[in-house]
C-alpha cells in the first residue's frame, strides 16, 4: 500500500525548494555565471555534507526505514573526491575545510542520525532527487562556465552505476512510497526536508556573500588602478 510519501515531500517542500533556487548565487550559477574559486568551495562544502550523510546512511543501512532507500549507486562523496583532486591537487584533503554553514549542516545530520535516524530519509531525498533531476543540465552549465577539458572536474554529476537516471528516480520514489511509515512520521520527514532545504540555502547564501566580497575587492582595486593611471596621464599633460 502506498503512503504517497514522495508526493507529500514534493508538495510539502515546494516553497522551500523555490526559495533555495532563488538564492542569488544559485541563480547566477544557473545562468552560467560562476568563477572557479566559488565553484571549488561549493564542491568542497558538498563533499563534507555527502560524506556525513553517506556515513550515517551506511551505519543505519539495516534499519527497516532506511534499507529500502539505501542505494550505494547514489553515493556522491567519492565522485566529489575526484573533482576536488582535479581542482586542488593531490593534497586536497589538507586544503579544504567545511564552512560555518556547512558545519551546521553536518552537525544536523549527525544529530538526527543519533536521535531519530528516520529523518535521514529527508536529507537523502533532498540531495539525491535533486541530483538525479538536474545533474546533466548543471554539468553542461558548469562545463561551459568553467571551460574544463573533457568533463574533468565534473564527476559529481555523473552516476556511472545508473544506466537510466529518470527510471532510477521513479524507482527511488516508489521505494519512498512503500516505507512503513505513519502519518506522524511522514509529517516529521517533510518537516526535516524543509530544514534540509534551508541548510542548503544557507550554504549558498554564504558563498554568495563570499563572492560579493571578492567582487567588491576586485572592483575597488580596479578603481584605485584607474585613478592612479589617470593621475599619471594628468601629470604628463
Swiss-Prot record:
A GO MF label: heme binding
GO terms for biological process, alphabetical: heme catabolic process; heme oxidation; photosynthesis; response to oxidative stress
GO cellular component, one term: chloroplast
Enzyme class: oxidoreductase
Gene3D superfamilies noted in UniProt: Heme oxygenase-like (1.20.910.10)
The enzyme's E.C. designation: 1.14.14.18
Keyword annotations: Chloroplast, Heme, Iron, Metal-binding, Oxidoreductase, Photosynthesis, Plastid
Subcellular location: Plastid, Chloroplast
Catalytic activity: heme b + 3 reduced [NADPH--hemoprotein reductase] + 3 O2 = biliverdin IXalpha + CO + Fe(2+) + 3 oxidized [NADPH--hemoprotein reductase] + 3 H2O + H(+)
Residues holding heme b: 17
Function: Catalyzes the opening of the heme ring with the release of iron. Key enzyme in the synthesis of the chromophoric part of the photosynthetic antennae.
Family membership noted in the UniProt record: Belongs to the heme oxygenase family.
Name the UniProt record assigns to this protein: Heme oxygenase
Organism: Guillardia theta (Cryptophyte)
